[in-house]
């Protein structure tokens, strides 16, 4: 597989063993260039071992195909992702193969694992390829791994692996001025220990020939001239505000700012023990969510979300507060009127605009293929339903499916990793010709024949814009931006265009820096980053020692009943927090049906949902770990009563006491009744 001249130009320092970032537009062949570097590395370096890191599960398979084609069967290659189920340990596979392609999370888990079969040292590898390397910042997994690399460098550990970063969009890091953007690019280079960012200087004409950009069009529409459904939702929210008696609370309903405000109110009310105020805030957030859905898709979708919430409240809550009874009655009294307005109100102008785009694109081109990007899984589901029901699109050959995240935050809206791979394959072979996607499909997805990309009412940064645009790779393809005139989304897209230019200027400025000045700057940034990380680690350790575990009580976030102590908690696999006190089972119920996670874990499987026996609040799920049943708790389902007052932690890693690791053998010896014989 021969490389193009611009690919040769950007990889030359990497072939000499230098750490570089390859900066090429989407679709210009970064992966192929990296595969060639890996091949030459395996040919020329004694005992070479390569790891390719990706940040999306579906890219593991895609990159596996590209690297195998390049390596032509001469070296052993394996791919690893979280959905593989039972497998040999990561460390064992690393020792037995020449090249591994895996998600960064798996490598990070292996670096910290105490098990010999699983554990691996970073220095086992002689080359690390970091795909979509612009994610190497702050506390991302990429940056956690590279921080360990920099610590080894500071200790003068030898030999260190070579690092090859790949990106189409380094970004500006939120900077709006050139100096800030340059500092962001330099920080990215420091994080990846980069000798130079490489982009074509002498072969630009050939690059332009092979990476033509789609035609961009702004498809803008007016707001609904009348909105009786939205008006009624706001009227109901006004009534809830009247009960709250908090005149200082903003009433800018249907905005992200309002959402942030009521989230803060619910958290503050929980800490203060104001149960009714917390309930009002939680319900106001659901109404606000409905307004946001209504703005994005249809009124019937917004109503369905509200109905789903109130149905769950009816089914799960076993203790009803006066405020909850009032709120349930308020919705029940007006739900028929809402249903009538939802089905008889005006169409969303953004959907009318989207219909025109799809009719034009899918009627005029041969074998069209497109992707609609939207913000949330909820809106993706709603858009797919609209596509299937819209009369005006029934005469057009549209075969659509979802492509959304594999997370498990909502059983009704997530996709499994296997589902993702199947959908991508069907899209690539033409069985499907339209994807309704969230950001999971923005990066790396290689669909050469995709000729239309629609960004539907999105408020994102310049990296997201560049990545989504890059999915349109066919000749004469179209990139359509759908938004309301004068909206925040439109203003942000225009800012993104300016930031893309700023990013290009910043990279050019870094490339032109004197090498000695550049290297000195990189060293300073690396030292500062390691010092900051060490200080943060020390601060977290101090925080974990703030209170003795036995002096911290666990309270249900909803009914405030005390259900355990910090000393009851243990960590499984370093992340899952379980309560091992046998008496804890007196405080919760377990659903009969297990939680559905279509992903096979190495040592555990999910059991049922666990919820507060007193009030019905969902706390988490039951984990069956090596045949032992353990209740896994969500940190946001618990309040912590400390000697200095109540707190609500956003992450278990931020709680003010130390949680020891789970000891399987000790637990089995002490709690034989927990064993599952299923």
From Swiss-Prot:
Q: Where is the Helicase ATP-binding domain?
A: 11-188
Q: Which EC number applies?
A: 3.6.4.13
Q: Which reaction does it catalyse?
A: ATP + H2O = ADP + phosphate + H(+)
Entry binding sites for ATP: 24-31
InterPro entries, from UniProt?
Helicase/UvrB_N (IPR006935), Helicase_ATP-bd (IPR014001), Helicase_C-like (IPR001650), P-loop_NTPase (IPR027417), RIG-I-like_C (IPR041204), RLR_C_sf (IPR038557), RLR_CTR (IPR021673), RLR_Helicase (IPR051363)
Q: Which residues form a coiled coil?
A: 489-546
Q: What keywords sit in the KW lines?
A: Antiviral defense, ATP-binding, Coiled coil, Cytoplasm, Helicase, Host-virus interaction, Hydrolase, Immunity, Innate immunity, Metal-binding, Nucleotide-binding, RNA-binding, Zinc
Motif DECH box: chain residues: 131-134
Q: What are the protein's GO molecular function terms?
A: ATP binding; ATP hydrolysis activity; DNA binding; double-stranded RNA binding; RNA helicase activity; single-stranded RNA binding; zinc ion binding
Q: Which GO terms describe its cellular component?
A: cytoplasm
Helicase C-terminal domain residues? 350-514
- Changing residue 634 to E does what? Abolishes RNA binding
Which sites bind Zn(2+)? 556, 559, 612, 615
Summarize tissue expression.
Expressed in testis, nerve and spleen. Also expressed in the brain.
UniProt comment concerning the protein's domains: The RLR CTR domain is capable of inhibiting dimerization and signaling of RIGI and also facilitates binding of dsRNA.
As for what it does, the entry says: Acts as a regulator of RIGI and IFIH1/MDA5 mediated antiviral signaling. Cannot initiate antiviral signaling as it lacks the CARD domain required for activating MAVS/IPS1-dependent signaling events. Can have both negative and positive regulatory functions related to RIGI and IFIH1/MDA5 signaling and this role in regulating signaling may be complex and could probably depend on characteristics of the infecting virus or target cells, or both.
Quaternary structure, from the entry: Monomer in the absence of dsRNA. Homodimer in the presence of dsRNA. Interacts with RIGI (via CARD domain), MAVS/IPS1 and DDX60. Found in a complex with RIGI and IFIH1/MDA5. Interacts with ANKRD17. Directly interacts with ATG5 and ATG12, either as ATG5 and ATG12 monomers or as ATG12-ATG5 conjugates. (Microbial infection) Interacts (via helicase C-terminal domain) with non-structural protein V of paramyxoviruses including human parainfluenza 2 virus, human parainfluenza 5 virus, measles virus, mumps virus, hendra virus and nipah virus.
Report the sequence similarity comment from the record. Belongs to the helicase family. RLR subfamily.
State what protein this is by name.
Answer: ATP-dependent RNA helicase DHX58
Record organism: Homo sapiens
Organism classification, top ranks? Eukaryota, Metazoa, Chordata, Craniata, Vertebrata
């Amino acid at each position: 597989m021969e490389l193009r001249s611009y690919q040769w130009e950007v990889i030359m320092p990497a072939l000499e063993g230098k750490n570089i970032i390859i900066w090429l537009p989407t679709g210009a062949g970064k992966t192929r260039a990296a595969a060639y570097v890996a091949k030459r590395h395996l040919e020329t370096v004694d005992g070479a071992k390569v790891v390719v890191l990706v940040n999306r599960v579906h890219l593991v398979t895609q990159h596996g195909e590209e690297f195998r084609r390049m390596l032509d069967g001469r070296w052993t290659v394996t791919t690893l992702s979280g959905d593989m189920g039972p497998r040999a340990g990561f460390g064992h596979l690393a020792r037995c193969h020449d090249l591994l392609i895996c998600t960064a999370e798996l490598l990070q888990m292996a670096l910290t694992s105490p098990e010999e079969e699983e554990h691996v040292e970073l220095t086992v590898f002689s080359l690390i390829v970091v795909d979509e390397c612009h994610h190497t910042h702050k506390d991302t997994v990429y940056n956690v791994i590279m921080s360990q690399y920099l610590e080894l460098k500071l200790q003068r550990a030898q030999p260190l692996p070579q690092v090859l970063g790949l990106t189409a969009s380094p970004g500006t890091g939120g900077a709006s001025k050139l100096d800030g953007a340059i500092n962001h690019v330099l920080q990215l280079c420091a994080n990846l220990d980069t000798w130079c960012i490489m982009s074509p200087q002498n072969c630009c004409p050939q690059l332009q020939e092979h990476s033509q950009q789609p035609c961009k069009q702004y498809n803008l529409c007016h707001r609904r001239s009348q909105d009786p459904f939205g008006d009624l939702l706001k009227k109901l929210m006004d009534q809830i505000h009247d009960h709250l008696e908090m005149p200082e609370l903003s009433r800018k309903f249907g905005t992200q700012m309002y959402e942030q405000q009521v989230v803060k109110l619910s958290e503050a009310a929980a800490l203060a023990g104001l149960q009714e105020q917390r309930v009002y805030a939680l319900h106001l957030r659901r109404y606000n969510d409905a307004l946001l859905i209504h703005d994005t898709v249809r009124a019937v979708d917004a109503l369905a979300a509200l109905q789903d919430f109130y149905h769950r409240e009816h089914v799960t809550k076993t203790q009803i507060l006066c405020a909850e009874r009032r709120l349930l009655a308020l919705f029940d009294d007006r739900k028929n009127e809402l249903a009538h307005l939802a089905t008889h109100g005006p169409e969303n102008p953004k959907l009318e605009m989207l219909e025109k785009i799809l009719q034009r694109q899918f009627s005029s081109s041969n074998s069209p293929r497109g992707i609609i990007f939207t913000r949330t899984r909820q809106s993706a589901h709603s858009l797919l339903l609209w596509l299937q029901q819209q009369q005006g699109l029934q005469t057009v050959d549209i075969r659509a499916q979802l492509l959304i995240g594999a997370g498990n935050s909502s059983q009704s809206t997530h996709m499994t990793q296997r589902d993702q791979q199947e959908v991508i394959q069907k899209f690539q072979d033409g069985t499907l010709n339209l994807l309704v996607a969230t950001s999971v499909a923005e990066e790396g997805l290689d669909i050469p024949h995709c000729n239309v990309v629609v960004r539907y009412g999105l408020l994102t940064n310049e990296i997201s814009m560049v990545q989504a645009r890059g999915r349109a790779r066919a000749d004469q393809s179209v990139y359509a931006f759908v938004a309301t005139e004068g909206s925040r989304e439109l203003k942000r897209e225009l800012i993104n265009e300016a930031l893309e230019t700023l990013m290009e200027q910043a990279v050019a400025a870094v490339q032109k820096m004197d090498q000695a000045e550049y290297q000195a700057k990189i060293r300073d940034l690396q030292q500062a980053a390691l010092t900051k990380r060490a200080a943060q680690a020390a601060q977290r350790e101090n925080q974990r020692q703030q209170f003795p575990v036995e002096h911290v009580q666990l309270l249900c976030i909803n009914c405030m009943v005390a259900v355990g102590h910090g000393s009851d908690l243990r960590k499984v696999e370093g992340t899952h927090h379980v309560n091992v006190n046998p008496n804890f089972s007196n405080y919760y119920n377990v659903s009969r049906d297990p939680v559905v996670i279509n992903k096979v874990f190495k040592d555990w499987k999910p059991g049922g949902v666990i919820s507060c026996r007193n009030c019905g609040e969902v706390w988490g799920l039951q984990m069956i770990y090596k045949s032992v049943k353990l209740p896994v708790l969500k940190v946001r389902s618990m309040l912590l009563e400390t000697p200095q007052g109540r707190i609500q932690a956003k992450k278990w890693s931020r709680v003010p006491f130390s949680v020891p690791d789970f000891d399987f053998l000790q637990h089995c010896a002490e709690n034989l009744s927990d064993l599952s014989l299923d």
